[in-house]
Amino acid sequence: MNVLVINCGSSSLKYQLINSDTEEVLAKGLCERIGIDGRLVCQKAGCDKEITEASMPTHKEAIQMVLDALTNDKTGAIASLKEVNAIGHRVVHGGEKFASSVVITDEVIQAVEECNDLAPLHNPANLIGIRVCGELMPGVPQVGVFDTAFHQTMPAKAYLYGLPLEYYKNYKVRRYGFHGTSHSFVSKRAVEFLGLNPEDSKVIVCHLGNGSSISAVVNGKCVDTTMGLTPLEGVVMGTRSGNIDPAIMEFIAKKENLDISGMMNVLNKKSGLFGLSGGLSSDFRDLNEAAEGGNQDAANAIDVLAYGIAKFVGGYVAAMNGVDAIVFTAGIGENAIPVREKVVSYLGYLGVTLDKDANGHRGEEIVISTPDSKVKVAVIPTNEELAICRETVALV
Protein backbone atom coordinates (compact mmCIF):
# COMPACT_ATOMS: atom_id res chain seq x y z
CA MET A 1 0.00 0.00 0.00
CA ASN A 2 1.21 3.51 -0.85
CA VAL A 3 0.33 6.17 1.71
CA LEU A 4 0.63 9.90 1.05
CA VAL A 5 1.44 11.66 4.33
CA ILE A 6 0.48 15.34 4.42
CA ASN A 7 1.49 17.97 7.00
CA CYS A 8 -0.33 21.14 5.98
CA GLY A 9 0.76 24.38 7.66
CA SER A 10 -0.57 27.91 7.27
CA SER A 11 1.88 28.76 4.45
CA SER A 12 3.69 25.47 3.89
CA LEU A 13 3.03 21.82 3.12
CA LYS A 14 5.32 18.86 3.79
CA TYR A 15 4.66 15.47 2.23
CA GLN A 16 6.03 11.95 1.95
CA LEU A 17 4.86 9.05 -0.17
CA ILE A 18 5.58 5.86 1.75
CA ASN A 19 5.28 2.22 0.73
CA SER A 20 3.72 0.81 3.88
CA ASP A 21 4.83 -2.75 3.12
CA THR A 22 8.55 -1.91 3.03
CA GLU A 23 8.23 1.42 4.94
CA GLU A 24 10.39 2.94 2.19
CA VAL A 25 10.01 6.65 1.41
CA LEU A 26 9.31 6.75 -2.34
CA ALA A 27 9.23 10.54 -2.58
CA LYS A 28 9.16 13.55 -0.30
CA GLY A 29 9.02 17.29 -0.53
CA LEU A 30 7.99 20.67 0.74
CA CYS A 31 5.84 23.49 -0.60
CA GLU A 32 6.87 26.85 0.85
CA ARG A 33 5.47 30.38 0.81
CA ILE A 34 1.95 29.32 -0.17
CA GLY A 35 -0.12 32.45 -0.76
CA ILE A 36 3.03 34.55 -1.27
CA ASP A 37 5.06 33.41 -4.29
CA GLY A 38 5.49 29.65 -3.92
CA ARG A 39 8.29 27.11 -4.11
CA LEU A 40 8.20 23.32 -4.39
CA VAL A 41 11.19 21.25 -3.28
CA CYS A 42 10.67 17.59 -4.18
CA GLN A 43 12.87 14.52 -4.14
CA LYS A 44 12.32 11.06 -5.55
CA ALA A 45 14.07 8.26 -3.67
CA GLY A 46 17.66 7.95 -4.85
CA CYS A 47 17.56 11.21 -6.82
CA ASP A 48 18.66 14.79 -6.31
CA LYS A 49 16.26 17.46 -5.08
CA GLU A 50 14.29 19.36 -7.69
CA ILE A 51 13.28 22.96 -6.94
CA THR A 52 10.40 24.61 -8.77
CA GLU A 53 9.41 28.25 -8.34
CA ALA A 54 5.70 28.56 -9.09
CA SER A 55 2.66 30.54 -8.09
CA MET A 56 0.72 28.90 -5.25
CA PRO A 57 -2.09 31.31 -4.37
CA THR A 58 -3.77 28.67 -2.21
CA HIS A 59 -3.15 25.19 -0.81
CA LYS A 60 -5.15 23.74 -3.69
CA GLU A 61 -2.47 24.78 -6.19
CA ALA A 62 0.24 23.52 -3.83
CA ILE A 63 -1.33 20.09 -3.45
CA GLN A 64 -1.95 19.89 -7.20
CA MET A 65 1.76 20.57 -7.75
CA VAL A 66 2.64 17.81 -5.29
CA LEU A 67 0.39 15.35 -7.10
CA ASP A 68 1.90 16.35 -10.44
CA ALA A 69 5.42 15.92 -9.03
CA LEU A 70 4.54 12.43 -7.80
CA THR A 71 3.52 11.30 -11.28
CA ASN A 72 5.62 13.24 -13.81
CA ASP A 73 8.51 11.73 -15.76
CA LYS A 74 11.31 13.57 -13.93
CA THR A 75 10.34 13.45 -10.25
CA GLY A 76 7.55 10.90 -10.29
CA ALA A 77 7.65 7.89 -8.01
CA ILE A 78 4.39 6.41 -9.30
CA ALA A 79 2.78 6.09 -12.73
CA SER A 80 -0.58 7.53 -11.72
CA LEU A 81 -2.50 8.77 -8.70
CA LYS A 82 -4.39 5.48 -8.69
CA GLU A 83 -1.31 4.11 -6.92
CA VAL A 84 -2.01 6.32 -3.89
CA ASN A 85 -4.11 4.03 -1.69
CA ALA A 86 -4.64 6.29 1.31
CA ILE A 87 -3.78 9.73 2.69
CA GLY A 88 -2.68 10.39 6.27
CA HIS A 89 -2.94 13.93 7.64
CA ARG A 90 -1.25 15.47 10.64
CA VAL A 91 -3.90 17.36 12.63
CA VAL A 92 -2.52 19.49 15.44
CA HIS A 93 -5.42 19.71 17.90
CA GLY A 94 -8.16 17.18 18.54
CA GLY A 95 -9.17 18.57 21.93
CA GLU A 96 -10.99 16.01 24.04
CA LYS A 97 -12.89 14.79 20.99
CA PHE A 98 -10.16 12.51 19.62
CA ALA A 99 -8.16 10.05 21.71
CA SER A 100 -6.93 8.17 18.64
CA SER A 101 -6.55 8.51 14.88
CA VAL A 102 -9.75 8.41 12.81
CA VAL A 103 -10.93 7.95 9.24
CA ILE A 104 -11.95 11.37 7.93
CA THR A 105 -15.70 11.88 7.49
CA ASP A 106 -17.88 14.99 7.33
CA GLU A 107 -18.60 14.52 11.02
CA VAL A 108 -14.87 14.35 11.83
CA ILE A 109 -14.22 17.53 9.83
CA GLN A 110 -16.94 19.31 11.80
CA ALA A 111 -15.49 18.09 15.11
CA VAL A 112 -12.00 19.28 14.12
CA GLU A 113 -13.47 22.67 13.19
CA GLU A 114 -14.92 22.88 16.68
CA CYS A 115 -11.34 22.63 18.01
CA ASN A 116 -10.11 25.51 15.84
CA ASP A 117 -10.11 28.03 18.67
CA LEU A 118 -7.62 25.78 20.52
CA ALA A 119 -5.20 25.89 17.55
CA PRO A 120 -6.20 28.87 15.39
CA LEU A 121 -2.99 28.86 13.32
CA HIS A 122 -2.77 25.13 12.68
CA ASN A 123 -6.16 23.40 12.59
CA PRO A 124 -7.67 25.53 9.79
CA ALA A 125 -4.61 24.79 7.64
CA ASN A 126 -4.85 21.07 8.44
CA LEU A 127 -8.50 21.13 7.39
CA ILE A 128 -7.66 22.87 4.11
CA GLY A 129 -5.30 20.01 3.30
CA ILE A 130 -7.99 17.45 4.08
CA ARG A 131 -10.62 19.20 1.98
CA VAL A 132 -8.35 19.81 -1.00
CA CYS A 133 -7.12 16.20 -1.03
CA GLY A 134 -10.73 15.05 -0.90
CA GLU A 135 -11.53 17.27 -3.87
CA LEU A 136 -8.50 16.31 -5.98
CA MET A 137 -8.51 12.61 -5.08
CA PRO A 138 -12.13 11.68 -4.43
CA GLY A 139 -12.63 8.17 -3.14
CA VAL A 140 -9.16 7.84 -1.62
CA PRO A 141 -9.58 7.21 2.13
CA GLN A 142 -8.12 9.86 4.42
CA VAL A 143 -7.06 9.51 8.06
CA GLY A 144 -6.50 12.23 10.66
CA VAL A 145 -3.63 11.67 13.12
CA PHE A 146 -3.75 14.10 16.04
CA ASP A 147 -0.79 15.64 17.88
CA THR A 148 -2.89 15.68 21.04
CA ALA A 149 -4.38 12.17 20.91
CA PHE A 150 -1.56 10.26 22.63
CA HIS A 151 -1.84 12.52 25.67
CA GLN A 152 -5.57 11.90 26.19
CA THR A 153 -4.73 9.11 28.65
CA MET A 154 -3.47 11.66 31.19
CA PRO A 155 -5.41 11.62 34.48
CA ALA A 156 -7.27 14.69 35.70
CA LYS A 157 -4.57 15.42 38.28
CA ALA A 158 -2.13 15.91 35.40
CA TYR A 159 -4.31 17.86 32.96
CA LEU A 160 -6.30 20.21 35.20
CA TYR A 161 -4.96 23.69 35.93
CA GLY A 162 -5.37 25.51 39.24
CA LEU A 163 -7.99 27.81 37.73
CA PRO A 164 -11.73 28.22 38.33
CA LEU A 165 -13.33 24.93 37.28
CA GLU A 166 -15.85 26.67 35.04
CA TYR A 167 -13.03 27.55 32.62
CA TYR A 168 -12.52 23.85 32.04
CA LYS A 169 -16.24 23.06 31.93
CA ASN A 170 -17.13 25.98 29.66
CA TYR A 171 -14.03 26.40 27.49
CA LYS A 172 -12.11 23.11 27.93
CA VAL A 173 -9.08 24.93 29.34
CA ARG A 174 -6.74 22.09 30.36
CA ARG A 175 -3.40 20.52 29.49
CA TYR A 176 -3.54 18.79 26.10
CA GLY A 177 0.09 18.33 25.15
CA PHE A 178 1.60 18.15 21.67
CA HIS A 179 4.15 16.16 19.65
CA GLY A 180 1.99 13.16 20.59
CA THR A 181 2.72 11.28 17.37
CA SER A 182 6.45 11.55 18.09
CA HIS A 183 6.10 10.64 21.77
CA SER A 184 4.02 7.58 20.85
CA PHE A 185 6.43 6.44 18.12
CA VAL A 186 9.57 6.92 20.21
CA SER A 187 8.19 5.41 23.43
CA LYS A 188 7.06 2.28 21.56
CA ARG A 189 10.39 1.99 19.81
CA ALA A 190 12.22 2.46 23.13
CA VAL A 191 10.43 -0.55 24.61
CA GLU A 192 11.46 -2.66 21.61
CA PHE A 193 15.01 -1.34 21.30
CA LEU A 194 15.84 -1.54 25.00
CA GLY A 195 14.12 -4.87 25.63
CA LEU A 196 11.61 -3.52 28.16
CA ASN A 197 8.38 -5.23 29.15
CA PRO A 198 5.61 -3.30 27.35
CA GLU A 199 3.19 -4.14 30.15
CA ASP A 200 5.59 -3.01 32.89
CA SER A 201 7.60 -0.08 31.59
CA LYS A 202 8.24 3.52 32.60
CA VAL A 203 9.75 5.70 29.90
CA ILE A 204 10.49 9.43 29.74
CA VAL A 205 10.66 10.84 26.20
CA CYS A 206 12.49 14.15 25.66
CA HIS A 207 11.40 15.52 22.27
CA LEU A 208 13.82 18.42 21.90
CA GLY A 209 13.78 20.63 18.83
CA ASN A 210 12.82 24.20 18.01
CA GLY A 211 9.68 23.22 19.89
CA SER A 212 10.31 20.87 22.80
CA SER A 213 8.20 18.69 25.07
CA ILE A 214 8.77 15.89 27.54
CA SER A 215 6.35 13.09 28.37
CA ALA A 216 6.02 10.40 31.01
CA VAL A 217 4.82 7.09 29.56
CA VAL A 218 3.72 4.14 31.71
CA ASN A 219 3.02 0.84 29.96
CA GLY A 220 2.65 2.65 26.65
CA LYS A 221 0.22 5.29 27.93
CA CYS A 222 1.03 8.94 28.55
CA VAL A 223 0.47 10.03 32.16
CA ASP A 224 1.91 13.56 31.90
CA THR A 225 3.53 15.95 29.44
CA THR A 226 5.06 19.40 29.56
CA MET A 227 3.13 21.31 26.89
CA GLY A 228 -0.29 22.52 27.93
CA LEU A 229 -3.35 24.14 26.40
CA THR A 230 -0.90 25.46 23.81
CA PRO A 231 2.68 24.57 22.80
CA LEU A 232 3.99 27.54 24.83
CA GLU A 233 4.16 25.73 28.16
CA GLY A 234 7.03 23.56 29.39
CA VAL A 235 10.77 23.75 28.81
CA VAL A 236 12.59 26.67 27.20
CA MET A 237 12.38 26.32 23.39
CA GLY A 238 13.83 28.02 20.33
CA THR A 239 11.78 31.20 20.60
CA ARG A 240 9.14 30.19 23.19
CA SER A 241 9.56 31.02 26.85
CA GLY A 242 8.26 27.79 28.34
CA ASN A 243 7.11 28.06 31.96
CA ILE A 244 7.20 31.52 33.52
CA ASP A 245 5.51 33.29 36.42
CA PRO A 246 2.21 34.40 34.79
CA ALA A 247 2.41 37.77 36.56
CA ILE A 248 5.45 38.62 34.43
CA MET A 249 3.04 39.27 31.56
CA GLU A 250 1.32 42.17 33.32
CA PHE A 251 4.60 43.52 34.67
CA ILE A 252 6.35 43.62 31.28
CA ALA A 253 3.21 44.74 29.42
CA LYS A 254 3.04 47.85 31.59
CA LYS A 255 6.76 48.56 31.28
CA GLU A 256 6.80 48.08 27.49
CA ASN A 257 3.28 49.39 26.77
CA LEU A 258 2.18 46.11 25.20
CA ASP A 259 -1.32 44.70 24.79
CA ILE A 260 -2.04 40.99 25.28
CA SER A 261 -1.28 40.18 21.63
CA GLY A 262 2.03 42.00 21.84
CA MET A 263 2.93 40.17 25.02
CA MET A 264 2.03 36.80 23.51
CA ASN A 265 4.22 37.63 20.53
CA VAL A 266 7.13 38.20 22.93
CA LEU A 267 6.53 34.87 24.68
CA ASN A 268 6.12 32.90 21.45
CA LYS A 269 8.62 34.52 19.08
CA LYS A 270 11.19 36.54 21.03
CA SER A 271 11.87 34.41 24.09
CA GLY A 272 13.40 30.99 24.76
CA LEU A 273 16.95 30.36 23.56
CA PHE A 274 16.66 33.35 21.23
CA GLY A 275 15.71 35.70 24.04
CA LEU A 276 18.13 34.29 26.59
CA SER A 277 21.03 34.66 24.15
CA GLY A 278 20.26 38.34 23.66
CA GLY A 279 18.73 37.74 20.25
CA LEU A 280 21.77 35.88 18.94
CA SER A 281 19.93 32.83 17.58
CA SER A 282 17.18 30.32 18.26
CA ASP A 283 19.30 27.56 16.68
CA PHE A 284 21.19 25.42 19.18
CA ARG A 285 24.09 24.94 16.77
CA ASP A 286 24.71 28.68 16.62
CA LEU A 287 24.48 28.99 20.39
CA ASN A 288 26.84 26.09 21.01
CA GLU A 289 29.41 27.57 18.65
CA ALA A 290 29.08 30.96 20.36
CA ALA A 291 29.32 29.41 23.83
CA GLU A 292 32.49 27.56 22.85
CA GLY A 293 33.84 30.92 21.69
CA GLY A 294 33.23 32.47 25.09
CA ASN A 295 29.76 34.01 24.70
CA GLN A 296 28.33 33.81 28.22
CA ASP A 297 24.75 34.60 27.20
CA ALA A 298 24.76 31.67 24.78
CA ALA A 299 26.26 29.41 27.45
CA ASN A 300 23.60 30.52 29.94
CA ALA A 301 20.83 29.78 27.44
CA ILE A 302 22.10 26.22 26.98
CA ASP A 303 22.42 25.77 30.74
CA VAL A 304 18.85 26.99 31.31
CA LEU A 305 17.61 24.49 28.72
CA ALA A 306 19.48 21.50 30.17
CA TYR A 307 18.60 22.40 33.76
CA GLY A 308 14.92 22.73 32.88
CA ILE A 309 14.87 19.37 31.09
CA ALA A 310 16.53 17.69 34.08
CA LYS A 311 13.94 19.19 36.46
CA PHE A 312 11.05 17.85 34.39
CA VAL A 313 12.72 14.44 34.14
CA GLY A 314 13.07 14.37 37.92
CA GLY A 315 9.45 15.36 38.37
CA TYR A 316 8.28 12.61 36.04
CA VAL A 317 10.38 10.02 37.85
CA ALA A 318 8.42 11.00 40.96
CA ALA A 319 5.09 10.97 39.08
CA MET A 320 5.75 7.44 37.78
CA ASN A 321 7.43 6.26 41.00
CA GLY A 322 10.50 5.23 39.03
CA VAL A 323 11.85 5.10 35.50
CA ASP A 324 13.30 2.38 33.25
CA ALA A 325 14.51 4.52 30.37
CA ILE A 326 15.09 8.13 29.37
CA VAL A 327 15.07 8.78 25.63
CA PHE A 328 16.23 11.79 23.61
CA THR A 329 14.72 12.53 20.21
CA ALA A 330 14.11 15.27 17.58
CA GLY A 331 16.66 17.78 16.27
CA ILE A 332 18.36 18.78 19.51
CA GLY A 333 17.73 15.49 21.27
CA GLU A 334 19.26 13.47 18.43
CA ASN A 335 22.20 15.74 17.65
CA ALA A 336 23.10 18.04 20.55
CA ILE A 337 25.80 16.11 22.39
CA PRO A 338 26.40 18.82 25.05
CA VAL A 339 22.71 19.05 26.00
CA ARG A 340 22.43 15.31 26.57
CA GLU A 341 25.62 15.34 28.63
CA LYS A 342 24.45 18.27 30.74
CA VAL A 343 21.02 16.73 31.37
CA VAL A 344 22.48 13.37 32.39
CA SER A 345 24.94 15.13 34.73
CA TYR A 346 21.95 16.04 36.93
CA LEU A 347 20.70 12.45 37.14
CA GLY A 348 23.39 10.84 39.26
CA TYR A 349 20.87 10.33 42.06
CA LEU A 350 19.08 7.87 39.76
CA GLY A 351 22.24 5.86 39.25
CA VAL A 352 22.54 7.09 35.67
CA THR A 353 26.02 7.06 34.16
CA LEU A 354 26.86 8.31 30.67
CA ASP A 355 28.98 6.53 28.08
CA LYS A 356 30.76 9.56 26.62
CA ASP A 357 31.92 7.72 23.51
CA ALA A 358 28.39 6.57 22.70
CA ASN A 359 27.04 10.05 23.45
CA GLY A 360 29.43 11.40 20.83
CA HIS A 361 27.23 10.00 18.06
CA ARG A 362 24.63 12.13 16.27
CA GLY A 363 21.35 11.13 14.68
CA GLU A 364 21.72 7.43 15.48
CA GLU A 365 19.63 4.96 17.43
CA ILE A 366 22.02 4.20 20.26
CA VAL A 367 22.24 3.53 24.01
CA ILE A 368 24.32 6.31 25.59
CA SER A 369 24.33 5.05 29.18
CA THR A 370 26.96 2.63 30.47
CA PRO A 371 26.10 -1.07 30.91
CA ASP A 372 26.04 -0.65 34.70
CA SER A 373 23.75 2.40 34.64
CA LYS A 374 20.64 1.76 36.75
CA VAL A 375 18.49 3.59 34.20
CA LYS A 376 18.93 3.15 30.45
CA VAL A 377 19.46 6.33 28.44
CA ALA A 378 19.10 6.24 24.66
CA VAL A 379 18.83 8.32 21.53
CA ILE A 380 16.03 7.23 19.20
CA PRO A 381 15.38 9.25 16.02
CA THR A 382 11.74 10.16 15.65
CA ASN A 383 9.79 9.54 12.45
CA GLU A 384 6.40 11.20 12.60
CA GLU A 385 5.67 10.58 8.93
CA LEU A 386 6.18 6.84 9.32
CA ALA A 387 4.04 6.91 12.45
CA ILE A 388 1.24 8.64 10.52
CA CYS A 389 1.63 6.08 7.73
CA ARG A 390 1.28 3.20 10.19
CA GLU A 391 -1.78 4.77 11.82
CA THR A 392 -3.35 5.27 8.41
CA VAL A 393 -2.76 1.68 7.31
CA ALA A 394 -4.23 0.39 10.58
CA LEU A 395 -7.51 2.19 9.88
CA VAL A 396 -8.02 1.65 6.16
What label would you give each PLM region?
Residues 69-84, 190-197, 313-324:
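Phosphate/pyrophosphate-binding loops at sites that engage ATP/ADP/AMP, CoA/4′-phosphopantetheine
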Residues 218, 224-259, 265, 330-361:
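Catalytic phosphate/nucleotide-handling subdomain of diverse soluble enzymes
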Residues 297-299, 303-324, 333-396:
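Internal helix-turn-beta structural module
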Residues 70-122, 143, 149-160:
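Short beta-strand-loop/turn "lid" adjacent to the catalytic site in phosphate-handling enzymes
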Residues 9, 89-92, 208, 327-335:
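Glycine-rich beta-strand-to-loop/alpha-helix junction loops that act as flexible
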Residues 150-255:
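Glycine-rich phosphate-binding loop of actin/hexokinase-like ATP-binding domains
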Residues 256-301:
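A mobile "lid/hinge" subdomain adjacent to the ATP/sugar-phosphate binding pocket shared
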Residues 3, 12-56, 228:
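Short glycine-rich, Thr/Ser-proximal phosphate-binding strand/loop in the N-terminal lobe
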